[in-house]
Amino acid sequence: MSRVSQARNLGKYFLLIDNMLVVLGFFVVFPLISIRFVDQMGWAAVMVGIALGLRQFIQQGLGIFGGAIADRFGAKPMIVTGMLMRAAGFATMGIAHEPWLLWFSCLLSGLGGTLFDPPRSALVVKLIRPQQRGRFFSLLMMQDSAGAVIGALLGSWLLQYDFRLVCATGAVLFVLCAAFNAWLLPAWKLSTVRTPVREGMTRVMRDKRFVTYVLTLAGYYMLAVQVMLMLPIMVNDVAGAPSAVKWMYAIEACLSLTLLYPIARWSEKHFRLEHRLMAGLLIMSLSMMPVGMVSGLQQLFTLICLFYIGSIIAEPARETLSASLADARARGSYMGFSRLGLAIGGAIGYIGGGWLFDLGKSAHQPELPWMMLGIIGIFTFLALGWQFSQKRTARRLLERDA
């Protein structure tokens, strides 16, 4: 085995271990934020939505800067610093008794993610061969799902005692992850050239096809982020107990572990990436619309199952498309900018979703936010279809293994 192949194989194992620690640290805390502050402390959903949206927008919206800096200085210092900053954000969240302090903790958490997320994504593009990326992204998603349910179970158990224990556990996990990276991560360069920060950002902004694709995905993310805000609140309302939220993540884990990799392997042989992305988005949109009309937990979990199946189909295709469009001369900048759709869609999804949830509740129209989200998903589906049908983008966007 050549030294390059050996480095790639070792890099895969490193990425998987690192990803599991990050996912556990995140899901111990974040799925329970809406339960803690809306259900237990009686805050308006829009207040929590602002906090979650702020974290999302800062982490993903500023990702191009984090990626460009990582292109210049390397992945390791950015990743370690960002993870320590997120640990500080979680520690602050544990003592948040006023909205401004929750917002500040989410600000710290988001800034930390801005530093570590783009270089971690760029490492995947660097270490995984193009023809293997779709399957590796599927493995990461399976790991995400397993880590999500383990983290949510642990967080739900700790919440019975004290929310400060929840936040402390998340902070400790990110400190461990920072130490793991500081100790074992080599000083890898992300790009094929040592790209100046401004040049990497300029290269991305001039790539109109990539920019259009990323911004179009904002509608997709408006739906996807509801697993952190409105779906946990809905499960709690229908079940009457916060402990039921863990079953939502258990469903995701079971579906991902059993279906994600087989679906990815089968669909990559029979369907183009853009068709998989659009099919998954359509299923997610249609499953959202009836959520506000259900009154039983079984019906709600059935719709959540459909939503997760749509995500299982769409997400590996979306990740692979983003990676295939990245310029090797500025990988960090490209992967950072690819998060802008999540920044915009996530912020609108959290803040707008929280506002619509409160509005629907006060107007006795609980179906309002869910119908609106479904309609947004349909419009995004049509916008992606228009974009993929353009001859000027066909050669790049329809390339499965570029």
Swiss-Prot record:
Q: Where is the signal peptide?
A: none
In which domain of life is the source organism classified?
Bacteria
As recorded in UniProt, coiled-coil segments are: none
Q: How does it sit in the membrane?
A: Multi-pass membrane protein
- Annotated Gene3D superfamilies: MFS general substrate transporter like domains
Membrane topology, Cytoplasmic segments: 1-12, 117-138, 186-213, 265-276, 321-339, 389-402
Which terms does the record give in the GO molecular function aspect? transmembrane transporter activity
Sorted alphabetically, which keywords does the UniProt record give? Answer: Antibiotic resistance, Cell inner membrane, Cell membrane, Membrane, Transmembrane, Transmembrane helix, Transport
Q: Which GO terms describe its cellular component?
A: plasma membrane
Question: What does this protein do, in the record's words?
Answer: Confers resistance to norfloxacin and enoxacin.
Q: What family is this? A: Belongs to the major facilitator superfamily. DHA1 family. MdtH (TC 2.A.1.2.21) subfamily.
Tell me the protein's name.
Multidrug resistance protein MdtH
Q: Which gene encodes it?
A: mdtH
